Curated annotation (Swiss-Prot):
Organism for this UniProt entry: Botryotinia fuckeliana (strain B05.10)
Name under which the protein is recorded: Trans-enoyl reductase BOA5
EC number(s) per entry: 1.-.-.-
Keyword terms: NADP, Nucleotide-binding, Oxidoreductase, Virulence
Annotated region described as Disordered, given as residue ranges: 1-21, 147-168
C-alpha cells in the first residue's frame, strides 16, 4: 500500500509497497480502508520534534471498516463508515490503518468522508479538555443536545452573568456560566464552542475578526479580537470579573497571558493544548493550569521527551470511550458540525507540501483534507 513515512526530522515521503497492516486476534482492533485524511498541527510538530524514521504519519482519518477483531464487543460491523484518531504513533496517512474500534465514531449517511475526516483529533481533544477531571471538569452535554450545566443563581450584570449581549433581553432567563475559548476558529475551537453551548455554558471566543462569523455560527455569544490592546481586560469587564474557565487552543506565552488576564478575581482553571509558559503561570497563584495532551486517551504510556512524556492514564481512555458515543449521537443529529474543510489535490502525495502551510501559519478557519481513495 501507499503511505506517508517519516524519514527524519521535518521530512516526510510518500512510499510505495508499504506492508498492509492486519488485525491481531485478541487486540480489540479494527482495520479501516482509509478514504480521506485531515491535517493537524500535531502532524508537523511530531515530525519536526519527535520524528520516528519509518513510522507512518497522521492522526485524523475517515474510511470503511474492512476487518474487526472477534474480541470486540461493539455495534461495529464490516462495511461501516467510520471516523477517528489512529494511535499514539499516528498511522492515518496510508491506504489502510489498524486502530482502536472503541474510539471510532460512525459517520452519518448524509456526511461525506472529507468532512468526517476533520473530526477525530478535535473530538477527543475537546472531550478531554472540557470534561476531564484534571482539565476544566465541566458538566457533560446530554445526547439529545440539551445542556446540563448548573445555572448561576444570582445575576451579576443587567443581562445576566456576563452581560449576555447574544443571549437574551429577558431578565427571567437563567444565565449561563461563561467559558473562554482562545483560538476559537481552529478546528478544536469550533468544536469546543459547540460543545460548551450544548453543555449549557456561554462560549466566549477569541480569534481574528475575519473568523467572527464562523465562531458565531457555531454558538459563540461574544467574540474578541486578540489583536486588540487590552483584550484580556475587555473580557474581564464583559464577564464582570468572574470568569473561571479558559481553554487555550493556541498556547503561546501571549495567548496564556491574555487568558490569565481575563480570568476573574477569584481565580479559576486554564487548560492548554501544548506545554504552557512557566513565567506566566507564576503570575497568578489563584489560576490552576493544566496541559491537556489528547494522546493519553489511548490509555498507554507516551514515550516522548520532556513535557510530552506521560504515564498510562486508563481514566482518560474510559472518558474517551464514553465521550465518542455522545459525540456520535450529536453528529448524527446535526448538533455538532464539522469545521470548514479545504480539499487539497494530490491525495497522500500532496500531504508533505501542505503540512508546511500549517507549519508557517498559512491556514486559518479551515482544515486541510485529502482524498485517499481515487488518488
Amino acid at each position: 500500500m501507499q503511505a506517508v513515512i517519516q524519514t527524519g526530522p521535518g521530512t516526510l515521503q510518500l512510499t510505495e509497497n508499504v506492508p498492509k497492516p492486519s488485525v491481531e486476534p485478541g487486540s480489540r482492533k479494527v482495520l479501516v480502508k482509509v478514504h480521506a485524511v485531515a491535517l493537524n498541527h500535531s502532524d508537523w510538530k511530531m515530525v519536526d520534534f519527535s520524528a520516528k524514521p519509518g513510522a507512518i504519519s497522521g492522526y485524523d482519518m475517515a474510511g470503511v471498516l474492512e476487518a474487526i477483531d472477534d474480541s470486540m464487543n461493539s455495534d461495529l460491523a464490516v462495511g461501516d463508515r467510520v471516523l477517528g484518531v489512529t494511535s499514539i504513533h499516528g498511522g492515518a496517512f496510508a491506504e489502510y490503518v489498524v486502530t482502536d474500534g472503541d474510539l471510532l465514531v460512525k459517520i452519518p449517511e448524509n456526511m461525506d468522508f472529507q468532512h468526517a475526516a476533520s473530526y477525530g483529533v478535535g473530538i477527543v481533544t475537546t472531550g478531554l479538555a472540557l470534561y476531564g477531571n484534571e482539565c476544566l471538569a465541566l458538566n457533560w452535554p446530554n445526547t439529545d443536545g440539551t445542556g446540563s450545566a448548573a445555572p448561576q443563581k444570582t445575576r451579576v450584570g443587567p443581562r445576566g452573568w456576563s452581560g449576555g449581549d447574544a443571549l437574551t433581553d429577558n431578565d427571567n432567563e437563567t444565565p449561563r456560566i461563561p467559558v473562554l475559548v482562545y483560538g476559537a476558529s481552529t478546528s478544536t475551537g469550533t468544536l469546543a464552542i459547540q460543545l460548551l453551548k450544548l453543555s449549557g455554558y456561554e462560549p466566549i471566543a477569541v480569534c481574528s475578526p475575519h473568523n467572527f462569523g464562523l465562531v458565531q455560527s457555531r454558538g459563540a455569544s461574544k467574540c474578541f479580537d486578540y489583536h486588540s490592546q487590552g483584550c484580556g481586560a475587555m473580557i474581564k469587564q464583559y464577564t464582570y470579573n468572574r470568569l473561571e474557565y479558559a481553554l487555550d487552543c493556541i498556547t503561546t506565552a501571549s495567548s496564556m497571558r491574555l487568558c490569565y488576564e481575563a480570568i476573574g478575581a477569584t481565580g479559576g482553571k486554564y487548560v492548554s493544548l501544548d506545554p504552557f509558559n512557566a513565567r506566566v503561570q507564576r503570575s497568578r497563584a489563584d489560576v490552576k493550569p493544566f496541559f491537556c495532551y489528547a494522546l493519553t486517551i489511548f490509555g498507554l504510556p507516551i514515550e516522548l521527551s520532556g513535557e510530552f512524556a506521560r504515564g498510562a492514564k486508563p481514566e482518560d481512555r474510559k472518558l474517551a470511550e464514553k465521550f465518542v458515543k455522545i459525540a456520535e449521537k450529536l453528529i448524527e443529529k446535526g448538533r455538532l458540525k464539522a469545521h470548514p474543510t479545504m480539499l487539497k489535490s494530490g491525495g497522500l502525495g500532496g500531504i508533505a507540501s501542505s503540512i508546511d502551510l500549517l507549519r508557517k501559519g498559512k491556514v486559518s478557519g479551515s482544515k486541510l483534507v485529502f482524498d485517499v481513495v481515487g488518488n
